[in-house]
């Protein structure tokens, strides 16, 4: 669970707080230096426990934006936590990966949110959200994304080739990105960028569009400099800061 506040991590001036199971504290502190760490109680599966819910709810009051789902895990505790975050957060929430999987049994929770929501499913997650096949999703991406966003009052980022971003009314189809970005970590990077832009004051739809475009452009430049086969998520992250200066 990432809580963002301030000017945005891509500018190295954001306040970023990471909420995570206590047992991974040594790993977090040995690899990251920028975030504020907020370790909380965990269950037997080493994921966030229901006992951490009060602490997480308190942390929501600190944030300008919340991103939840990346590496979260799937069990009863995480389902309760994600649903409660959606219902109680007064700031925008970005749902990715297991954050999306955690609402599959209670999609109506999206309609009970107090604050704006952004969902970032890949085609498989989108298929599970609407009870369809991946082939059905891929055959009608724009209509399906737009309908879901309209029915659930959210911004939807349907990832893939030509990522679709929609608020249920307007639609943006992205033209940046390449097959080399189909690797672990790129979706997490995008989620963080969307959350960062929202924390800087952008509305959710604009933040999602900008993040998707710049994220894809970052991947394209990385592929040009290295190769689509050889590029890594670390290569993209190393390039992002310099790329952002082009948009100031």
Task: Indicate where each model-derived feature is located.
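Small-residue (G/A/S/T)-rich helix-start motifs and N-terminal tracts that mark the onset
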Residues: 4-92, 101-118, 123-248
